[in-house]
Amino acid sequence: MKVVLFCGGYGMRMRSGACDDVPKPMAMVGPRPLIWHVMRYYAHFGHTEFILCLGYGAHHIKDFFLNYEETTSNDFVLRGGRTELLSTDISDWTITFAQTGIESPIGERLRRVRHHLDGDEMFLANYADVLTDAPLPEMIDRFAARDAGASMMVVPPQSSFHCVELGEDGLVGGITAVGELPLWENGGYFVLRQEVFDHIPENGDLVADGCAQLAKQGRLVAHQHRGFWKPTDTVKERAALDAAYAQGDRPWAVWERAGVGARA
């Protein structure tokens, strides 16, 4: 199944300076950028056809893959000056690099790569900046068995804030942590059918337009995930993931638990 990755946004909260043009999916976690970790997750489950929706800082993403160094995350033997890899990461990946505009909303980026999805009843999509250990095969199978146009992974609210219940007299009736409320957030992992394109207007958004319309029609399903899920919307969040990687605490690296692929 093909995987569409949205990796053309500015990622302003991740920028370290006025001249920093590195897109958020290229922020490093360990020796590899975020986008690599997301792609390696999908590849672990057999999904190795990727469509990258490029925009801001596209050359960074192109350069990374055009000059990809397998020895960074794989064991190898140096024999007579020649490198013999004992395993590889991306040798079986097919990657389409598609320029989808600098200012384009997510929905418009998806519209602009639709021709790369011709003939695919279902496909996967992702923001390319969120890591998880969610069971992807289960997510796909549950969606395939449903008569729906889209599925989104949802997670409990990540905020550490508390909600305060007020009475008319100004007295506090209760305090509840946001994470304990019966609310769910968009987790950024999607399984989609071609039907979704019928609900995304020009310059529209995947969630606010496409998913919202499907929800009104009862054709949007959710996959609830309470396991590991971490965004990288800020420098602090990215740094926390990088530190966890260095300590060997990387639950999103499902390929490592299987004993194959990238190593520390």
Which positions does each model-derived feature cover?
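N-terminal glycine-rich phosphate-binding loop and ensuing alpha1 helix
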Residues: 1-68, 97
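Short loop segments at secondary-structure junctions
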Residues: 31-32, 102, 168-170, 193-196
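Well-ordered alpha-helical segments embedded in enzymatic catalytic cores
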Residues: 34-37, 109-112, 210
